[in-house]
């Protein structure tokens, strides 16, 4: 309720900016100057958009009586406001980029640097778990329980509380905010933060040294990560040796890597005409992951699914054994397939391909081995492009693009892998051909944010070709 009250105040804070006749902009000299007309118009447009987005979020929270116990779950599930929140943050980022100067830019870097260090410190000493989820507690008690200096803990809280992570309800006391509490109730949030603090940030700060020392190297054990960790073990091998690192990396990709969430993928895929395939009792082959088969099987009982996973991938059998699930017995089958091996199923209506990595050569191999199957089946293939960087012409907001490019940099600093962008993927598709035909782009599936989450391709005969 406090969050809702704060949101309702935001429009009154923003309106003076819309009605102001003299807007100021900070320039590199740090001296205020009158904005040019184009920049002023852009700022007013962004502010109007932000007001609309705030009102949309307030409406989503207000549409259900969340205080009524019977409706609390519905409020949480139907009005989580994730899309509206994302839009608001994107607009705020664009406004900030216009109005901030070097001073504000550096101040923000300083805050984020110490915030990351503070959260890592709080996590290392398990302090967040020592604070009750729903009541305040003396900072001294938390310090004693965690065996850390009270003064240092108070300093950490002094910063994080100003950023909405923990709160000081009164002097000498601390309590959780919804944000900090989520790092206790959902430990993967803390795993993601610990990865950023312990692996990503140190590797990023070794990037210059890595460039100087490994100028021409493309091997996966001569990286910024290897310098930061003083090891010659490649990042992928390090994950195999350390379950903690593997868990933290997965948490980072899920929460902060800019990858589309499962429900976003499901919404985008639902736009396709699966019912046409379902009526014909068609088969769908999902390659490399088990994400699309289950939600689609619930919607279309006549569809049959084969999920092909690499040997050693975590078993999905238990997922198929839930007696309460409406999925029909035998509707989904699971088989092993080595990435890059020929596609043995040549009569599927749809192939859903999850790219094996961001390495162009591996992506090209997967596309080439599916070409004969697409030619023989006359089917289509969905290439899930969540791990592909957005192209320059993508209608995606700057904040979402920045998150994706941050992931690309982290991937490079960890393993020397360069993530492909969407334009490069489409150019690669044009090279996948045989003597009679080639792959052609049919459609792009976009999320609500404008990100392309999948491209739909098919096999097309070339002029003079014969099947």
From Swiss-Prot:
Residues 139-158 bind DNA. Keywords: DNA-binding, Nucleus. Residues 109-179 form the HTH iclR-type domain. InterPro entries: SAM-dependent_MTases_sf (IPR029063), WH_DNA-bd_sf (IPR036390). SUPFAM superfamilies: Winged helix' DNA-binding domain. It is found in: Nucleus. GO terms for molecular function: DNA binding. Disulfide bonds: none annotated. Coiled coil: none annotated. GO terms for cellular component: nucleus. Induction: Expression correlates with the formation of the sclerotia and thus the pigment production. PANTHER family: MONODICTYPHENONE CLUSTER TRANSCRIPTIONAL COACTIVATOR MDPA (PTHR43712:SF15), PUTATIVE (AFU_ORTHOLOGUE AFUA_4G14580)-RELATED (PTHR43712). Transcriptional coactivator; part of the gene cluster responsible for the typical purple-black color of the ergot sclerotia. The ergochrome gene cluster produces several ergot pigments including the yellow ergochrome secalonic acid and its derivatives, as well as the red anthraquinones endocrocin and clavorubin. With CPUR_05433, coregulates the production of geodin. This is Ergochrome gene cluster transcriptional coactivator CPUR_05432. It comes from Claviceps purpurea (strain 20.1) (Ergot fungus).
């Amino acid at each position: 309720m406090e969050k809702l009250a704060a949101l309702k105040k935001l429009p009154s804070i923003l309106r003076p900016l819309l009605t102001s006749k003299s807007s100021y902009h900070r320039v590199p000299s740090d001296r205020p100057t009158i904005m040019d007309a184009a920049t002023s118009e852009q700022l007013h447009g962004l502010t109007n958009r932000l007001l609309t987005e705030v009102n949309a979020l307030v409406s989503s929270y207000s549409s259900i009586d969340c205080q009524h116990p019977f409706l609390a779950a519905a409020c949480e599930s139907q009005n989580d406001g994730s899309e509206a929140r994302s839009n608001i943050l994107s607009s705020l980022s664009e406004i900030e980029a216009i109005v901030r100067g070097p001073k504000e830019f550096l101040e923000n870097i300083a805050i984020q640097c110490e915030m990351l260090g503070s959260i890592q410190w709080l996590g290392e000493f398990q302090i967040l778990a020592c604070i009750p989820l729903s009541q305040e507690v003396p900072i001294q008690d938390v310090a004693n329980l965690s065996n850390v200096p009270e003064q240092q803990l108070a300093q950490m809280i002094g910063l994080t509380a100003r950023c909405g992570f923990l709160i000081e309800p009164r002097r000498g006391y601390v309590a959780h905010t919804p944000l900090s509490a989520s790092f206790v109730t959902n430990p993967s949030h803390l795993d993601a933060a610990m990865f950023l603090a312990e692996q990503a940030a140190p590797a990023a700060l070794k990037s210059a040294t890595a460039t100087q020392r490994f100028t021409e190297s493309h091997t996966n054990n001569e990286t910024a990560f290897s310098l930061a960790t003083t090891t010659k073990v490649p990042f992928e091998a390090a994950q195999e040796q350390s379950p903690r690192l593997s868990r933290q990396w997965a948490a980072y990709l899920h929460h902060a890597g800019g990858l589309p969430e499962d429900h976003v993928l499901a919404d985008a895929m639902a736009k396709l005409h699966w019912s046409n395939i379902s009526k014909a009792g068609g088969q769908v082959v999902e390659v490399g992951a088990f994400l699309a088969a289950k939600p689609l099987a619930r919607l279309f009982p006549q569809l049959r699914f084969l999920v092909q996973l690499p040997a050693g991938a975590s078993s999905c059998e238990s997922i198929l054994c839930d007696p309460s699930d409406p999925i029909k017995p035998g509707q989904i089958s699971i088989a092993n397939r080595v990435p890059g091996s020929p596609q043995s199923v040549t009569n599927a209506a749809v192939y859903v391909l999850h790219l094996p990595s961001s390495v162009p050569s591996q992506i090209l191999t997967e596309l080439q081995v599916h070409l004969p199957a697409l030619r023989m089946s006359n089917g289509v293939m969905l290439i899930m492009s969540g791990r592909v960087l957005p192209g320059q012409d993508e209608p995606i907001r700057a904040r979402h693009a920045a998150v994706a490019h941050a992931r690309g940099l982290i991937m490079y600093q960890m393993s020397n892998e360069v993530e492909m962008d969407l334009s490069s993927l489409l150019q690669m598709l044009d090279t996948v051909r045989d003597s009679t035909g080639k792959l052609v782009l049919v459609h792009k599936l976009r999320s609500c944010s404008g990100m392309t989450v999948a491209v739909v391709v098919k096999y097309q005969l070339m002029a003079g070709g014969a099947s």
